[in-house]
């Protein structure tokens, strides 16, 4: 249903279209099948908790993706007899964050690990964006309702890191966090 955002259909179609969105058809067979198992498990995990999985579906899946998904459809990842939480995303800046930092819930099988292939496969890995201090001043002052000092080097101070070396907290010119 377009207005409610609810999609219904058979599992093969939904998982195939999810896989098509996440990895497309350019990866090797085993990578596509692994994504299919993760997507299927994610949907079943949500259903088992009385929730609806949030997935993005391609308009259609290629015949190759559909065929590979069909080979593994129904296979799932379990932890202690229940469907595992199998969140997925394209890149993690070289290291994942633990579930406890992302979801505020500990899943012992979702710990921070190095992801050395991000640099090889993520087109944005290592990219940088630059903004003028005037632009940043305007955006920050407008959003936070504060007046920044004259020294841009004081505007952002990291006060704590989480696992994966992600920023856990920061101070904005000593006035907001």
Where do the protein language model's features map onto the residues?
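Conserved, single-site charged/polar hotspot
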Residues: 1-177
């Amino acid at each position: 249903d377009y207005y409610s955002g609810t999609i219904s259909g058979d599992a093969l179609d939904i998982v195939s279209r999810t896989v098509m969105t996440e990895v497309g058809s350019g990866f090797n067979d085993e990578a596509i099948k692994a994504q299919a198992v993760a997507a299927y498990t994610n949907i079943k995990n949500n259903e088992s908790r009385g929730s609806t999985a949030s997935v993005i579906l391609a308009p259609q899946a290629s015949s190759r993706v559909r065929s590979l998904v069909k080979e593994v459809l129904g296979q799932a990842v379990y932890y202690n007899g229940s469907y595992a939480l199998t969140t997925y995303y394209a890149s993690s800046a070289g290291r994942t964050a633990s579930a406890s930092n992302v979801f505020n819930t500990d899943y012992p099988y979702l710990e921070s690990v190095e992801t050395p292939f991000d640099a090889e496969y993520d087109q944005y890995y290592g990219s940088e964006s630059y903004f003028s201090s005037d632009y940043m001043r305007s955006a920050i002052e407008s959003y936070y309702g504060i007046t920044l000092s004259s020294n841009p080097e004081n505007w952002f101070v990291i006060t704590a890191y989480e696992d994966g070396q992600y920023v856990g907290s920061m101070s904005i010119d000593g006035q907001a966090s």
